[in-house]
Amino acid sequence: MRIKKLALIILTFSLSLPVLAENSTSIVDENRLLQADKETDNWLSFGRSYNNQNFSPLKQINTSTVKRLVPKWVFQTGEKGSFQTQPLVADGVMYATIPGNDVVALDAAKGTVLWRYKHKNRREKTKAGPANRGAALGYGKVFEATNDGRLIALDKNTGEIIWDKIIARPTDAELQGLSETQKKFLTENIDSLPAKMAPLIYKDLVVVGVTSAGYGLFYNIFEGITSEKVPPHDRFLGIRGYVAAFDVNTGKEVWRWYTTKSGAWEGKFSTTTPEGDKLPRDIPREKELATKLKDRWRIGGSSTWMTPSFDPKLGLIFLGTGNASPNDVSSARPGDNLYANSLVAIDAYTGETRWHYQQVPHDLWGYDVASNSVLFDLPDGDNVIPAIGIAGKTGWFYVHNRNTGELIYRSEPFVPQHNLFQAPTDKGIISFPGSWGGASWSPVSYNPKNGWVYIPGIHKPTRYRLQYGQFEGKEVPYILTEVAESEPNWGTLTAIDTRKQGQIQWQIKTEQPLIGGVLATGGNLVFMGEGNGMFAAFDSGNGKRLWEFNCGAGVNAPPISYKVGEQQFIAVAAGGNSYFKYPSGDSIIGFGLSSK
């Protein structure tokens, strides 16, 4: 089915005054969040439940009936821009964030507006665009982390603000040892620490992390961090990334875990990845610089892009971390740069590190661990391993024992790989996946019925070139990272069997890189959107495209499925992606089966 204009397919569209939906007063409490997998009609948290599997067991829409899938309603936000939200649904009400950090509550069966919170941005500039990846629901509140560095709790029935807290302000400990000039710089530039992820709620805590910490650039590798010199123009200092937990009732910070390890972020000066891939490092030079730059962890960057998964039995949350800062001048950050580019397990109640696995020590290429982590059980003979998997920008799916962090295996590569860990040169090298490739933030989906994981991939080659700049009379080398415009780029949707050491079961190629995420269902379907506006359903067993619909704008957000009454719905945001230059829009579309 292909329709160019959404106006032709709108069955219900409303900007009505607030009206309470049936059962809207039901509270999503701790027990419901713990048992979210059993609430098949709802989608209570990001990824649907704490395991982050992005799987719905609903099967009214299946391989036989999907050809009858049609739009049942369309809600247009009035705000165009990169639209990355994953809506939540509880008891017939949908909650969604939109670009610019407004939050809406909709009748999930009709798409009509129940209430809308209009966000007033406190900062005119941030280091990231207006996109937001979703809300969290619990204890009678809707929580949103914003692009102006705030965490907001709204009344779930009215959208009224309950509390509103700044989360991006540096602590006194972070500012310790800095000059007054640098303290002022960091404090006045907290707008460079927005938040994108949907918050995570458990017990009485709401957890969220900050982004853009790794955008800091080089300013002086020859002086200590206490230098009075502040980088000119846009040569921003990096800021120490973190994830933090807040009291759900007051917004008071309970603990904060930093993505850069204080005093020991140099690590072991690893010459290879953990799997043995050789890294281009001058260890003697790095060790020499490390003595001069021992406090560089204070501005070490490393963002947190996606909502952590949570294991209530182990009491651990799991998240991936971004690249260290400055990314373009590696000599300014000698050592492995712990815990950048890592999968990390954190005590959910104290914020203490349990284990970490650094995929790429001393990253030169922008290989953030940006995608969502997924929890699942991995058969091992007569036993079961509590496993965690995460797709990397390196192009592999990594599977670990989530209790110990031990790597069980990494999969077959789901995108092409070339010059993966090659050192940049004066002439320049072309590498892929590169900074834009592999698995970005887009959520993967895991089907617990067969153990297959479905990964949206990006093939977008990168050119890395050494450049030389003058700073304070010294010539400083830095890495210029560019899209390799002469190279073709595309996307891949890959099914990988986690029970067969990560073997690829099928793979399809798409015209454009895939950004947005996938949904697997009990109807043996996988749903995925594309930048060209197509929203499609595939047979989860063989990758055959069974259905598609042109949404009129890039579908670059993770879909969900839920049920209201006797009707199963598939819902997704269609608003495009400005970074990839996909067509913009402002719609959330709810699909269901037609009677014929």
Language-model region placement:
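Bacterial N-terminal signal peptides
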Residues: 7-18
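Beta-propeller fold recognition
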Residues: 29, 391, 395-438, 442, ...
